[in-house]
């Protein structure tokens, strides 16, 4: 009897673990003016595209309140442009990250031809955003306007 209860508890706890851990992702291809960006995005995220004179902005809004921006264009400002980073890394691109006054996480990746950033991310959700940003692949394209 004790063994059945322990096995039942183990099965229930593993089911809860796997239901929380499994998110469905789809491949997104974004066409910026001169760059094609491929990334793996969680399903159920709201997507908004805005074109302006010098570039394009893709905004992804998550249920948890986090926002992911992918943009091209030198004059476009983001809500985190004035934040002071707690750490900066420079490898193939510049990575800056930190925490705002409310304790929410943010990160800004600056590539040569576009920028990617997230903000308003609760610390427990940050791993999901890292997965998206660290999985970005891009290639230059020739786009006629």
Question: How would you label these PLM feature ranges?
Answer:
Residues 33-39, 43-47, 115-145:
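Surface-exposed amphipathic alpha-helical segments
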Residues 58-60, 100-111:
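Short, surface-exposed beta-strand/loop micro-motifs that present aromatic residues
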Residues 80-106:
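Short Gly/Thr-rich strand-loop-strand
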């Amino acid at each position: 009897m004790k063994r059945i209860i322990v096995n039942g508890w183990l099965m229930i706890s593993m089911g809860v673990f796997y239901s929380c851990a499994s998110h469905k992702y789809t491949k997104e291809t974004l066409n910026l003016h001169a760059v094609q960006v491929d990334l793996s995005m969680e399903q159920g995220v709201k997507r908004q595209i805005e074109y302006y004179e010098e570039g394009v902005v893709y905004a992804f809004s998550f249920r948890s309140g986090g926002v992911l921006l992918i943009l091209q264009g030198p004059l476009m400002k983001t809500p985190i442009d004035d934040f002071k980073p707690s750490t900066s890394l420079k490898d193939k691109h510049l990575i800056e990250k930190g925490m705002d006054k409310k304790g929410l996480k943010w990160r800004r990746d600056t590539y040569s031809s576009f920028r990617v950033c997230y903000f308003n991310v609760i610390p427990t959700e940050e791993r999901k955003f890292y997965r998206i940003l660290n999985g970005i692949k891009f290639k230059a394209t020739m786009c006629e306007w």
